[in-house]
Structure formats: structure tokens, C-alpha cells
Amino acid sequence: MSGYFLYHSIGTYPGKAEQVKTALDRYSDIWSAENDSQWPAMLAERAHFIRSWENLIGAPAGTMTTVENVTLALYSLIGALPDELLRGRRILAAADCFPSLHFLLTGLQARFGFTLETVPVRQGESFVRDEDFIGAWGNDVAIALVTWVSSTTSKRADMDLISKHGRQQGTIIVADVTQGVGIRPFSVGEIDVVVGSSLKWLCGSSGAGVIYVRPGLLTVCEPELRGWFSQPDPFSWDFDTFAYADDARRFDHGTPAVLAAIASQPGLDFVSGTGVDVLALHNEQLTSMIVERVAANTALTLVSPQKSQERGGSVMVQAVSVEQAAAIVTTLKNENFYCDCRSRILRFSPGSVTSEEETAALCDALDRLTIG
């Protein structure tokens, strides 16, 4: 066990280094061989990675593919939808969504003719409430971008409630599951689009993102970002006979990257082999310890939801100042506790390598550094 509280950044698990090394050594051997086995083997590895994700979130076969990151996934979706679906309508996002996605949508408004509406955080609060998000959501909303778990507060959206409202409004629901998948149970259910990363609680590599598109929506998507791998047969090179694959492969484009998927497979195997419920229980025990101790610390303010069922796997705490937050992170690092901060917000995410003893010691250190 260790003082590692950075699962919101990069996830890890016991034995990760050796297992990833084994996977990458195998890749190196195959990729460097002087024969023609490379691509068949590597594309099979990529397909295995995709199936692992499908199994993890209950997605039907053929509804997922790889992307480099969630920003590219969302861009591919926007460029795939019929013009009349977006033009003159709204895309709804919360003020606590992942900034990269907001940056993207802001830049695409003029070209695609939609208006980006950002639902604000209430005065004096830290995250956008589900009821406020739903309150801003009418039948003129083409896409609702839902952050399942916030990266700044760990607030977890009620996806059942949101999905029900989305169906009533005829809206495409896009769920960003990056900060929650692998540490809380998640199923695609009736959600239209899911984007996510393997980097956090799935203990994988950067570059191993995914996109899921509901089967009924797939048939109307024609991604403008397309290429030879968008086709049923990538080796169909007749310029005049391009056709999209009838499954999620239509969201592929050029030659796919495989290395990130290979480096991430051990983490996916660990999560599926251990069980998300088991990992969630351990995490909930540790995060509840932090929440309880922060509540008794008069110098720190909890910005995550108080109730465990409303949180993801992290606990976010507000320091008195930006300078204090940075100083706390530095001091904790010197004491072998690893966390980070965003402005005044300290972020703590315990996982499978984090023990109760280390969590209690972290809380003791926070008390010492803030209230003496």
C-alpha cells in the first residue's frame, strides 16, 4: 500500500509495472519481427481492448471504437450528425464539465450553427445541480453533454434521472464517464453516446480513449473525419465507392493507433477481474474517512457532495488560498502523499494501492498543515 491519491490523474494497481512491461515487451517482439505478423496481431489486440470496454459498460458488440481522447471523440460526433439536427438548436453543458470539451464546443458553434449554453453553478455552491441542468433543458436542446463525475468536485450525476428527461425532450445524451468508469458501476442503458478514457480508474495509458454510439443513432452518423478504416473493408481503395461501415468502425479514420490500447489492457483486466463493486467498496471506505475528517477541520471546506451515493471516487477540498493549496501539495509530496490541486481545490482519490492507514495518516497531515 502507499500514499497514492492521484487516481483522478493516473490510475494504478498492485503489479501494474510488471504487467504493463510484459504487454509492451510482447508488442515490441511482434512489431519488430521481420515477417508479416504485425498488423494481424496488433489489430486483434485493439479489438480485444474494445471488447473489454463493451463488456465493462454493457455496450452491444460493434458499438464502440477507439479514439485518442474524449475531445476528439466529441468532435467526431459533432461532425457526424445531420446538419438539421444541430443548426439553430442548443447544446447544453454544465459549468463544471471538463474544460477541453467546452473549449471545443465554443469553437464549433459558428460553423455548425448551434448555440452552446452553459448551466451555471449556484452562488456559493461548488457544482451544478442535476435539477438546474434539467431546468435549462427544453426540446430545443440537440445534445446534452453530461459529465457523469466532475473532475473538480467528484459530484456524480444521476444518469437515470437525466436519461429519462432526455428521452422526453428527444435530445441526444452524451455522457463523459472519464472520472467515474472503473470505480463506480456504469451501464450505457439508454444513453446515446458515451466518451471516456482508460487513464484514470481503469489504470491505463493516455491515448486509450473510446466512443460508444447507440445502435439506432449509428445509422444516421456520417463522420466528416473519415478515412480508409471507416469502411467495412479498409482495403477498398476505389475513390468512387467509399462507404461507411455499418457499426462503430465508421468513427475510425486513418491507420489506428494500437500501442495505447495494448498498454491499457492490463488495467482493464485488473478492474474486470477484481470487480468494480469490490473496488468501489474499498474506495467508499477511504473517501468517507476523508469526508469525515474534513468536516471536523475548520480550515478546510468540502466541495464534494457529502453523501457517498452522490460522489465519484474522489474527494475535493477547498483550501484558504491558492498559495496554501499549492504549499499543502508540496509538503504532502515530501511526506510521500501524492495528490494535486486545481486553484484552491485539493483533490484526493484513493484506490486499490491506498490503505486505511495511509488515508488516516493523510488526514492527520492535513490537520497539522492547516489547523496545527
Q: Where are each of the predicted segments found?
A:
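Pyridoxal 5′-phosphate
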Residues: 1-372
